[in-house]
Amino acid sequence: NLPNSQKTLSAFCDKSIPFCQMVLHGSIQYTGDPINLYHDEGVQLLNMIEYGYTPYYKLTASGSMQLKYTENNEIFSSKYSLWKKSIANAYKISQMLSSVQGETMSSHESDGIHSVVVYGNGAKLYVNYSSSEWTVDEKNVSAGGFLFVDSNGTKTEKWGSEK
């Protein structure tokens, strides 16, 4: 799995560029951090969408308390039955973006709150991490959501409680 480029900022950098993701997207499938082990599932789903990750979860059949005294004690939320609905939703979102899975990322622009990704086939992805609606290119992107415009101009949107 590739690191989330948002985490790689240092005191010497004021902007993050998802270099690895831009180079690899369209060539191989890759994952990011496990969605179920991130402090905010909605943000991690938006990261997955923005950076082109394949959904990734670390799961167990029983609760994570059974891992407390093992080498896997960092796994704090892993019971499959609790994540089943979220997993189905993440794969549904991934399927929505399947038309760009084999495409390169031509450009990636981000101010840390809003991101625009353009793919080799001309499709565009708008990601809004803000708690307010975002208007860009005469399009509205819901708070905490994304808008995908495929190469034919067809829009697909997911947001808020539907994530």
Language model regions located:
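Active-site-proximal substrate-binding groove within the catalytic cores of carbohydrate-active enzymes
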Residues: 1-163
